[in-house]
């Protein structure tokens, strides 16, 4: 009986702890840039890798550069482990796509799943483009507005960012018209008020951008929303397929253990019930015998 109780306790412990690996040796950490992923030339940026898993070490790796992997001892603060990588004096050589990994001391060669990629871009290298709004920077809620980024420089790609947003939109430059190269970013409906800037870049150096355009404030009158269209991010209605895959996989793994726990609990209760019935059996027989004896005595008195 004690072995069964111990087994039930162990299964319940794992279910409560949720100790199921998501992917890799440990689940992926998060990678952030402070103050942001767009860094002016010669300025400093801090890349922070953090996780609620207590990693002792973090590794920072830039894609395509094997000799630029940095290792840092993690700090444990308020239930979070983190490591800060400072990139001083930003140059073209340091721009690119970064990922970070976590590891623990007793398994230093087993890394966690990689963090989501983070693009670090150097800005301020080329002539700034111009940013304008059509029909104008002030529109009614529900109306369409188009932001046009243009320059006489032959940029291959234009990037539009909104102040306070982590991601940006990008479009290839259209054919040269009136000695300018232009990309038009439609915002439809016009519920995306905020301050916008645009940048230009060349095809062979996607992480090296121009200077920022002058800021453009788009004002939306009426009922406005701060939603920002992102073709790369799914809406909350459709959900993230990757996240759903993790949830489904975790549920499939937990289901057999849940069934096992139910089976053990049912068997334990059945054994307990059977033991209780066996204990009550002799007492019941003695009661019946006493009743039979009393009934026989009563019959003898009556015949007498």
Swiss-Prot record:
Keywords attached to this entry: Cell membrane, Disulfide bond, Glycoprotein, Immunoglobulin domain, Membrane, Receptor, Repeat, Signal, Transmembrane, Transmembrane helix
Residue ranges annotated as Extracellular topological domain: 22-245
Tissue: Expressed on a discrete subset of peripheral blood NK cells.
Record: glycosylation sites: 67, 84, 178, 223
Bilayer disposition of the protein: Single-pass type I membrane protein
Known function: Activating natural killer (NK) receptor that recognizes C2 epitopes of HLA-C alleles. Bridging the innate and adaptive immune systems, NK cells express a number of cell surface receptors which either inhibit or stimulate their cytotoxicity. Able to activate NK cells citotoxicity and cytokine production such as IFNG. Receptor functions are attenuated even lost in some alleles, such as KIR2DS5*002 represented in this entry.
UniProt cross-references to SMART domains, sorted A to Z: IG
Region (Disordered): 275-304
InterPro entries: Ig-like_dom_sf, Ig-like_fold, Ig-like_Receptors_ImmuneReg, Ig_sub, Immunoglobulin_dom
Composition-biased stretches (Basic and acidic residues): 288-304
Cysteine pairings via disulfide bonds: 49-100, 149-198
Gene Ontology BP terms: immune response; immune response-regulating signaling pathway
Record family assignment: Belongs to the immunoglobulin superfamily.
Entry PTM: N-glycosylated, glycosylation varies depending on the allele which alters cell surface expression levels.
Keyword Protein transport: no
Domain Ig-like C2-type: residue ranges: 42-107, 142-205
A cellular component term, taken from the record's GO annotations: plasma membrane
Stated name of the protein: Killer cell immunoglobulin-like receptor 2DS5
Membrane topology, Cytoplasmic segments: 265-304
Organism expressing this protein natively: Homo sapiens
Signal peptide positions (record): 1-21
Transmembrane segments: 246-264
């Amino acid at each position: 009986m004690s072995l069964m109780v111990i087994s039930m306790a162990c299964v319940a412990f794992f279910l409560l702890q949720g100790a199921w690996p998501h992917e890799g040796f440990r689940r992926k950490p998060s990678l952030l840039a402070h103050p942001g992923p767009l860094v002016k030339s010669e300025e400093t940026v801090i890349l922070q890798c953090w996780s609620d898993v207590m990693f002792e070490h973090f590794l920072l790796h830039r894609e395509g550069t094997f000799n630029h992997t940095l290792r840092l001892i993690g700090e444990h603060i308020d239930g979070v482990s983190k490591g800060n990588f400072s990139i001083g004096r930003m140059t073209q050589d340091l721009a690119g796509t970064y990922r970070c990994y976590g590891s623990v001391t007793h398994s230093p060669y087993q890394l966690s799943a990689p963090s989501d990629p983070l693009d670090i871009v150097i800005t301020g290298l080329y002539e700034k483009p111009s940013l304008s709004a059509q029909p104008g920077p002030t529109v009614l809620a529900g109306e369409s507005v188009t932001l046009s980024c243009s320059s006489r420089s032959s940029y291959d790609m234009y990037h539009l960012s909104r102040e306070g947003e982590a991601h940006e939109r990008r479009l290839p430059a259209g054919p040269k018209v009136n000695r300018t190269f232009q990309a038009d970013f439609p915002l439809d409906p016009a519920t995306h008020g905020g301050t916008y800037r645009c940048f230009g870049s060349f095809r062979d150096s996607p992480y090296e951008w121009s200077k920022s355009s002058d800021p453009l404030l788009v004002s939306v009158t009426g009922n406005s929303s701060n939603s920002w269209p992102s073709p790369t991010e799914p809406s909350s209605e459709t959900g993230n397929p990757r996240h759903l895959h993790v949830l489904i996989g975790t549920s499939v793994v937990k289901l057999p253990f849940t069934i096992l726990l139910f089976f053990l609990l049912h068997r334990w209760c059945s054994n307990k019930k059977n033991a209780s019935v066996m204990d009550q059996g002799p007492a019941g027989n003695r009661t019946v015998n006493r009743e039979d004896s009393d009934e026989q005595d009563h019959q003898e008195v009556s015949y007498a």
